[in-house]
């Protein structure tokens, strides 16, 4: 509905928050839904920026107590690597794109931007970061996606927990790997270094 109305009234300043690899993780429901919106934007000829963020670093706020209390990093993210991104960086890029489109004297064409962090991290990498931050050993117990789903069912609908499990299984087989030049492009766009997982962990522990 929103895209049809945008087309009818001639809105030229559209920034859509999709997800990295939306065109590849097609068995993951919320990825497939976002890719459907991307296709609509493209096929309708809308001038938009499509932002494709990787795994949100701030997702891990929810497992701080598990890390500090049990000495494990429980998210089944595997060993391919995820280019985890800070949501503040996402918000800043979105704002910059809206401003760029607002200030342009001519309509700006469709473009896609992968939003990634400075590091592509495995489960072992993240456990090591927590070990350094806390000064106590933190281990990565492995890739139990079924157990991950069962745990999520305690506080979200079953269908959503299943969706999350499917996503985590794709983490294990493909990861979330940035394209060549993504990190440099974002660093140039923001005019500063990208926020890292270590920055997040330090801040969370000191809060």
Give names to the regions the model predicted.
Residues 107-108, 146-207:
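A hydrophobic C-terminal alpha-helical subdomain
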Residues 18-19, 179:
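Short secondary-structure boundary segments
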Residues 4-13, 19-139, 143, 150-151, ...:
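Oxidoreductase cofactor-interface core, primarily capturing Rossmann-like NAD(P)-dependent enzymes
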């Amino acid at each position: 509905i929103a895209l049809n109305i945008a087309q009818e009234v001639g809105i030229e300043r559209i920034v859509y928050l999709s997800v990295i690899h939306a065109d590849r993780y097609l068995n993951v429901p919320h990825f497939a839904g976002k890719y459907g919106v991307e296709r609509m934007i493209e096929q309708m000829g809308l001038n938009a920026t499509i932002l494709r963020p990787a795994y949100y670093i701030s997702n891990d706020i929810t497992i701080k107590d598990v890390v500090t209390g049990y000495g494990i990093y429980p998210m089944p993210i595997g060993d391919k690597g995820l280019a985890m991104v800070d949501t503040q960086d996402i918000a800043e890029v979105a704002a910059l794109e809206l401003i760029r489109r607002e200030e342009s004297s001519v309509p700006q064409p469709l473009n896609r931007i992968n939003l990634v962090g400075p590091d592509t991290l495995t489960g072992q990498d993240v456990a090591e970061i927590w070990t350094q931050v806390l000064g106590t050993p933190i281990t990565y117990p492995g890739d139990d996606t079924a157990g991950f789903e069962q745990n999520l069912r305690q506080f979200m609908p079953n269908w959503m927990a299943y969706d999350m499990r499917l996503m985590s299984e794709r983490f294990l087989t493909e990861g979330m790997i940035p394209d060549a030049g993504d990190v440099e492009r974002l660093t140039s766009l923001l005019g500063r270094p990208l926020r890292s997982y270590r920055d997040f962990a330090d801040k969370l522990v000191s809060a």
